[in-house]
């Protein structure tokens, strides 16, 4: 048989052309140990800090420890089925969560997946959970108020848009209640809200969601949940995920409010992860970077400039500043604010609202201690009318506390002292407020006006609550235009003062309570 070399070469060429090898470059490693949600991986040479690692079964782990011959990663999900020898793959991606207006009104987990049974979320965009905070040049000073609806807070410890105001106190002092009321008060203000629940019971979170829905505030709120039954990794990441969702609004010239409830539990989750990763422990067994854990989170709350918003949106949004206001919550043990995490967060934030157990049990709710509560930047943002009227409130309360302690030892007090005690007692009573009943600017201004101008001198202490309720009802009915004007402008002048005088005097002359 004669072999034709040309035919053979053509045949070989055809075979080579048809031969197809599908190949993909993958960064693959092997699990060498699994314990308590922490896996050690050998062979992932090019992995990044914070990279998502794909595990068998569709779950992911987060690379946190990059060591010479292995990678320590924390599993974001169930880890019972993971075994030594299993293959894992580096994704080359940092953890991202869905963001955008589609998230509003929904309850999601740390990864942005819906857990409220209302179907999938069609979010168009995602954002990394870890983002560098805006620089000094990109920021604008805080000068717009964020009304919490609490008389005691808005008058003595005002909060501005873009501020970080810590709510601190022992367990069962009304910290969550204050934050939820602040969210409810934003329902008609155009401010979006994000509530991040960290390490709480699922029943407690369900109750919060129900209350937000009842008061019409859930529609402009995103609830991010990492409950007590979730892994430490998800509890540690939840605040960053919520912050990324809030930054979407900030960077597009909108205003947003984020509540972290609470950062003590996040610090404990991070301590657990760090100890399991064998990082050296420091004070109270926390790792050395626990300050950075909170500072990099809270620095992302800011008021950003017009130029920043224009640059971020490529000129689509013009002439608007955006803001993200943070209300972190810290739980203290027996009132000890000098513990490690509380002192860290106090030094990072722009002020703190201190809630006292003694005041709470005495029926003063919200249990705000005006002596050690402070707002370092909110004064510039306070509504003009509240600023003008509330100057004497803090002084009256401070003098009352001082005199009340002195009066316990002395029976014969002069008239001036008795007057001061009576006034302080009434101001304390006036600062009390029911839960889920945030007050408008007009309502707050009117109540403070009656105290400051001496209209309460002839009102009995036990009838003060009835007096306040009747006065506000009368004012909303008879002076509706004035109420509307003050709620929208917050202005204060001689004309408004005269109308306030007329309102209160007419009420006292014609009404009963």
UniProtKB/Swiss-Prot annotation:
PROSITE patterns named in the record: ATPASE_ALPHA_BETA
Family matches, as Gene3D superfamilies: 2.40.30.20, ATP synthase alpha/beta chain, C-terminal domain, P-loop containing nucleotide triphosphate hydrolases
Catalysed reaction equations from the record: ATP + H2O + 4 H(+)(in) = ADP + phosphate + 5 H(+)(out)
Keywords, sorted A to Z: ATP synthesis, ATP-binding, Cell inner membrane, Cell membrane, CF(1), Hydrogen ion transport, Ion transport, Membrane, Nucleotide-binding, Translocase, Transport
Enzyme class at the top of the EC tree: translocase
Residue intervals passing through the bilayer: none
Site for Required for activity, residues: 373
A Pfam family: ATP-synt_ab_N
GO MF term set: ADP binding; ATP binding; proton-transporting ATP synthase activity, rotational mechanism
Binding, ATP: 169-176
Cellular localisation: Cell inner membrane
Keyword Translocase assigned: yes
Bilayer disposition of the protein: Peripheral membrane protein
Catalytic activity, EC: 7.1.2.2
Listed GO CC annotations: plasma membrane; proton-transporting ATP synthase complex
Chief location category: membrane
Main function: Produces ATP from ADP in the presence of a proton gradient across the membrane. The alpha chain is a regulatory subunit.
Protein family according to the UniProt entry: Belongs to the ATPase alpha/beta chains family.
The protein's assembly and partners: F-type ATPases have 2 components, CF(1) - the catalytic core - and CF(0) - the membrane proton channel. CF(1) has five subunits: alpha(3), beta(3), gamma(1), delta(1), epsilon(1). CF(0) has three main subunits: a(1), b(2) and c(9-12). The alpha and beta chains form an alternating ring which encloses part of the gamma chain. CF(1) is attached to CF(0) by a central stalk formed by the gamma and epsilon chains, while a peripheral stalk is formed by the delta and b chains.
Protein name: ATP synthase subunit alpha
Species per Swiss-Prot/TrEMBL record: Aliivibrio salmonicida (strain LFI1238) (Vibrio salmonicida (strain LFI1238))
């Amino acid at each position: 048989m004669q072999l034709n070399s040309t035919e053979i070469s053509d045949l070989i060429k055809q075979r080579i052309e048809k031969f197809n090898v599908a190949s993909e470059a993958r960064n693959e490693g092997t699990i060498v140990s699994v314990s308590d949600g922490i896996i050690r991986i050998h062979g992932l040479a090019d992995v990044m800090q914070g990279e998502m690692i794909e595990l068998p079964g569709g779950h992911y782990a987060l690379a946190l420890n990059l060591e010479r011959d292995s990678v320590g990663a924390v599993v974001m999900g169930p880890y019972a089925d993971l075994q030594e020898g299993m293959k894992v793959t580096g994704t080359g991606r940092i953890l991202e969560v869905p963001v955008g207006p589609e998230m509003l009104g929904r309850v999601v987990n740390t990864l942005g997946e819906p857990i409220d049974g209302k179907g999938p979320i069609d979010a168009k965009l995602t954002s990394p959970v870890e983002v560098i905070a805006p620089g000094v040049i990109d920021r604008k000073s805080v000068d717009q108020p964020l009304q919490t609806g609490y008389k005691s807070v808005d008058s003595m410890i005002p909060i501005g848009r873009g501020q970080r105001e810590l709510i601190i106190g022992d367990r069962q002092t009304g910290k969550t209640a204050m934050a939820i009321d602040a969210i409810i008060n934003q329902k008609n203000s155009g401010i979006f809200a994000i509530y991040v629940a960290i390490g709480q019971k699922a029943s407690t979170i369900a109750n919060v969601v129900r209350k937000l829905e009842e008061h019409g505030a859930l529609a402009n709120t995103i609830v991010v949940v990492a409950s007590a039954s979730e892994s430490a990794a998800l509890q540690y990441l939840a605040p960053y995920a919520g912050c990324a969702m809030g930054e979407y609004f900030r960077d597009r010239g909108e205003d947003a409010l984020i509540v972290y409830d609470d950062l003590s539990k996040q610090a404990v989750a991070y301590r657990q992860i760090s100890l399991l990763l064998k990082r050296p422990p420091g004070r109270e067994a926390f790792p050395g970077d626990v300050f950075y854990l909170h500072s990099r989170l809270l620095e992302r709350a800011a008021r950003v400039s017009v130029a920043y918003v224009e640059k971020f949106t490529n000129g689509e949004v013009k002439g608007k500043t955006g803001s993200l206001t943070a209300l972190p919550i810290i739980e203290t043990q027996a009132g000890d604010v000098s513990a490690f995490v509380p002192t860290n967060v106090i030094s990072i934030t722009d002020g703190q609202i201190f809630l006292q157990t003694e005041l709470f049990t005495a029926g003063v709710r919200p249990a705000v201690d005006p002596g050690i509560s402070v707002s370092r930047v909110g004064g510039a943002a306070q509504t003009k009318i509240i600023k003008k009227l509330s100057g004497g409130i803090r002084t009256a309360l401070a003098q009352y506390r001082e005199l009340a302690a002195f009066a316990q030892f002395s029976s014969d007090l002069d008239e001036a002292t008795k007057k001061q005690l009576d006034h302080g007692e009434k101001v304390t009573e006036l600062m009390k407020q029911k839960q889920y009943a945030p007050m408008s600017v007009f309502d707050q201004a009117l109540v403070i006006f009656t105290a400051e101008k001496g209209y309460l001198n002839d009102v009995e202490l036990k009838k003060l609550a009835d007096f306040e309720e009747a006065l506000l009802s009368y004012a909303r009915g008879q002076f509706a235009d004035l109420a509307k004007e003050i709620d929208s402008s917050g202005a204060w002048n001689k004309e408004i003062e005269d109308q306030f005088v007329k309102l209160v005097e007419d009420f006292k002359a014609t009404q009963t309570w």
